[in-house]
Structure formats: structure tokens, C-alpha cells
Curated annotation (Swiss-Prot):
Organism: Klebsiella pneumoniae (strain 342)
Pfam families linked: Ribosomal_S15
Subunit record text: Part of the 30S ribosomal subunit. Forms a bridge to the 50S subunit in the 70S ribosome, contacting the 23S rRNA.
CDD domains linked to this entry: Ribosomal_S15p_S13e
GO biological process, one term: translation
Record-level GO cellular component terms: cytosolic small ribosomal subunit
The protein's role, per its UniProt record: One of the primary rRNA binding proteins, it binds directly to 16S rRNA where it helps nucleate assembly of the platform of the 30S subunit by binding and bridging several RNA helices of the 16S rRNA.
MF terms in GO: rRNA binding; structural constituent of ribosome
Keywords for this protein: Ribonucleoprotein, Ribosomal protein, RNA-binding, rRNA-binding
UniProt cross-references to InterPro entries, sorted A to Z: Ribosomal_uS15, Ribosomal_uS15_bac-type, uS15_NS1_RNA-bd_sf
Name of the protein in question: Small ribosomal subunit protein uS15
Similarity annotation: Belongs to the universal ribosomal protein uS15 family.
């Protein structure tokens, strides 16, 4: 259910400020978004998997908190990230 090492490395290099920047808010949000999108396909097939659905809701909540933090700290980076990820906000 998790992302492959290659997929994570690609996201880190795309959204990170440096090559090994895996801790910035943008990278964390991008990784959570990729995992959320991956799980949405899982739930199309496994509708009664409530255990994984709880994990999905936790990821969505964590992403929401990180986006709120980024919006408070730097609105320009927040808007750019929302645009790059294609999130609704």
C-alpha cells in the first residue's frame, strides 16, 4: 500500500529544495497526496476495508494540518503547492 522507494525519491527531488530534502512541508504534503491518491484506487475495489480507510482519514487530516501551517507561514509557497498538486483549494 505504500509508495515505492523510486516514487518517493522522485517526489522528493521534484518538490524538495535540495536533493535530500525530505522534511520540508512541500515534500511531506506531496508524499501524503501521492499516498492518498494511491489508496483511493484501492477503495474503488475494496469498499469494506474500514481498517485502511481509517489510515486514509489520518493521512488526509495530517495533510490538512501541514497545508494550514504552510498557509500561515508563507501564502505564496502554499498557493504554488496547491497549484502544482492540483488540489481543490
Amino acid at each position: 500500500m505504500s509508495l515505492s522507494v523510486e516514487a518517493k525519491a522522485k517526489i522528493v527531488s521534484e518538490f524538495g529544495r535540495g536533493e535530500n530534502d525530505s522534511g520540508s512541508t512541500e515534500v511531506q504534503v506531496a508524499l501524503l497526496t501521492a499516498q492518498i491518491n494511491h489508496l483511493q484506487g484501492h477503495f474503488a475495489e475494496h469498499k469494506k476495508d474500514h481498517h485502511s480507510r481509517r489510515g486514509l482519514l489520518r493521512m488526509v487530516s495530517q495533510r490538512r494540518k501541514l497545508l494550514d501551517y504552510l498557509k500561515r507561514k508563507d501564502v505564496a509557497r502554499y498557493a504554488a503547492l496547491i497549484e502544482r498538486l492540483g488540489l481543490r483549494r
